[in-house]
Regions:
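HotDog/MaoC-like acyl-thioester-processing domains
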Residues: 2-81, 87, 175-176, 187-244
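Hydrophobic beta-strand-centered segment that forms part of the acyl-chain substrate-binding groove
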Residues: 5, 9, 23-30, 149-181
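Long amphipathic N-terminal alpha/beta scaffold segment
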Residues: 60-131
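Active-site helix/loop of acyl-thioester processing domains in fatty-acid/polyketide metabolism
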Residues: 119, 137-160
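A structural connector/turn signal
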Residues: 131-132, 169
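Short, hydrophobic/π-rich interface segment
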Residues: 140-143, 147, 164, 173, ...
Length: 244
């Protein structure tokens, strides 16, 4: 079980494994992660402003051309789907481009997670880019956030796994541009199967639940992990690191 008050570092998508040491934090790796996070911040700002802007059409086209120029520079050296980013560390919990927590992801809020006793707590603010109904978040975004946090709770409890079932109940719309608070905790462990439950509220009113969810996660057998991840890199065949 994770220690109470353990803080998640930026870019960490799941709890570091107790049996595995975190990757060596050499200067070059720290610098690359910092640069990835800096680019991620800039891209998230661009995505948000692109969703909010009302500038004239000619300005939109100018910005589109500039964005394509930047994309060309980034595209000079890329990875494939079977190659992990050089800044990632599965055993240490670092997935820099994770869709929910990744500090390098243009699409992540990102969700910041910490361990608090037996529970895990996540905080984030959703901008206009996550809009579903006007002024409120898309329901799929709420499910995505809770799926990530429930999985983090499972890994923090020493039971990492992949999602096999997610049940979400929407009690009220989730407001945009409003600080949010999510909590999750493991409620049951049966063999390789783990059940976790969580809620989503605003930070200002944590007693009023907007969305609640229950997720079931299963730890992969070694042969399953090898089949799914064996072609990516050797330590990805370890079933203890096979999760989001």
């Amino acid at each position: 079980m994770a220690d109470s008050g353990s803080m998640s570092e930026p870019g960490r998508s799941h709890h570091p494994l107790a049996a595995r040491a975190a990757s060596t934090q050499d200067a070059a790796l720290r610098e690359r992660r910092a640069a990835i996070a800096e680019l991620g911040d800039a891209l998230r700002e661009l995505v948000e402003l692109a969703s909010a802007t009302e500038v004239p059409a000619d300005v939109l086209r100018q910005v589109a051309a500039q964005a394509r120029q930047a994309a060309t520079r980034l595209g000079r050296q890329t990875r494939t789907r079977t190659e992990l980013p050089g800044a990632d560390d599965l055993a240490g919990g670092f997935r820099m481009y994770n869709l929910v927590t990744g500090s390098g992801s243009a699409l992540a809020p990102p969700l910041h997670i910490e361990v608090a006793g037996q529970a895990v707590v996540g905080t984030c603010t959703l901008g206009l880019a996550y809009e579903g109904p006007p002024a409120f978040a898309h329901g799929g975004t709420s499910a995505m956030l809770l799926d990530q946090l429930l999985g983090y709770a499972a890994s923090a409890a020493g039971q990492p796994g992949m999602t096999v079932k997610l049940e979400t109940r929407y009690l009220a719309p989730v407001p945009l541009q409003t600080p949010l608070r999510l909590t999750a905790e493991v409620s049951e462990v049966t063999g390789r199967h783990v059940t976790a439950r969580g809620t989503l509220t605003t930070a200002a009113d944590p007693d009023t639940v907007l969305v609640e969810a229950s997720g079931e996660f299963v730890s992969l057998r070694p042969e399953q992990a090898a089949r799914l991840f064996g072609g990516i890199r050797p330590d990805a065949t370890d079933p203890q690191v096979a999760h989001d």
